[in-house]
Amino acid sequence: LSSLGLTARAGANPMITGIAVDSREVREGTLFAALPGSRVHGAEFIQYALRMGAAAVLTDAAGAKLAAEELAGSDAALVVSGLPREALARTAALWFGGQPATMIAVTGTNGKTSVSTFVRQIWVEMGLPAVNLGTTGVEGAWAAPLAHTTPEPITLHRTLAEAAANGIT
């Protein structure tokens, strides 16, 4: 994480074996990202993540304050970021590695999945392997469902790395 400008405020210098934003996915050695949410702060799940074996916690100042007691009794490294969601995205990009060199993003209120599907289909007709992500999940060179229409950074970067590994350039 130091290559991203992130340093631990407290805890050990652990060997990270995975990253998770959902405490139910934490295993021994995982970096748990406790992000602020629209209804609940992820820091409310730090105690559970620590019990599951989290070796490090990435959160914001509010999350560190919310979970101060749990973290004080732990060897887990605590990484506090003013922009924890961005820090998680950069961490996930570094963790999963390679991504296709050519990507497009479609924004707006309506038609995003349709437009990205059309672009993928055009690229495939041109002989370019492609996938698109959207409401219908991952489509193209392989298909997979997505839990959210806008995937969390971990899911996004895992999928992009899988695309690169499957020859999507």
Question: Language-model segments: what does each one mean?
Answer:
Residues 87-169:
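Phosphate-binding loop of NTP-binding sites
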Residues 1-90, 94:
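N-terminal leader/targeting and accessory segments in enzymes
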